[in-house]
Amino acid sequence: MLFSFRAIVLFYCCMLTFAGIGFLWNPKFVVESGLVALIGASMEVKPLIVTQDNLSTLALSGLVFLILGMIYTISLLQSNFLFFSGITPIRAIFDFILTGFIYLKKEHIASNSLTFTFAFCDLMWQFWMFAAMSEERAKYLKNQKKAEELAARKAREVEES
């Protein structure tokens, strides 16, 4: 793999935190960014227009992104591989369904360029994390096997004494 699993997750945490701060600080900057416009236009999804009515929704989205960034950062610092191996496929399936729904139902209220860009980019990151997870999974299983062997050896030593 070009980047390690930890590097991919760390960059993903930074992106979530940046998006969260962007939505809280200046949501118009995030909504009107080039990536959102490019992906939205390429999929022919209507653009989201920032108004006074949807500022609270964008701020709530910013808080959700910040919380997600903190959850992923804490799990990364704890080396909680089981969290990532459980949540990554679920998030990928959810993002795939959301992306397909937005593309097929272009008149729905949730179908806009910002939502599609988030779902598409998040799907890309989840697949990338899942692909990089194979190396991490091998290390985790190796450490688990060593821990089980050590526990069995200690149990035999206790029985012998």
UniProtKB/Swiss-Prot annotation:
Disulfide bonds: none
Topology with respect to the bilayer: Multi-pass membrane protein
InterPro entries xref list: Incr_loss_mito_DNA_1 (IPR018815)
Subcellular locations according to the entry: Endoplasmic reticulum; Membrane
Main location group: endoplasmic reticulum
Signal peptide boundaries: none
Topological domain ranges for the Lumenal compartment: 28-56, 103-112
Domain of life the protein comes from: Eukaryota
Transmembrane residue ranges: 7-27, 57-77, 82-102, 113-133
Entry keywords, A to Z: Endoplasmic reticulum, Membrane, Transmembrane, Transmembrane helix
Stretches in topological domain Cytoplasmic: 1-6, 78-81, 134-161
Single GO cellular component term: membrane
A Pfam family that the UniProt record links to this protein: Ilm1
Family that this chain belongs to: Belongs to the ILM1 family.
Protein name: Protein ilm1
Lineage: Eukaryota, Fungi, Dikarya, Ascomycota, Taphrinomycotina
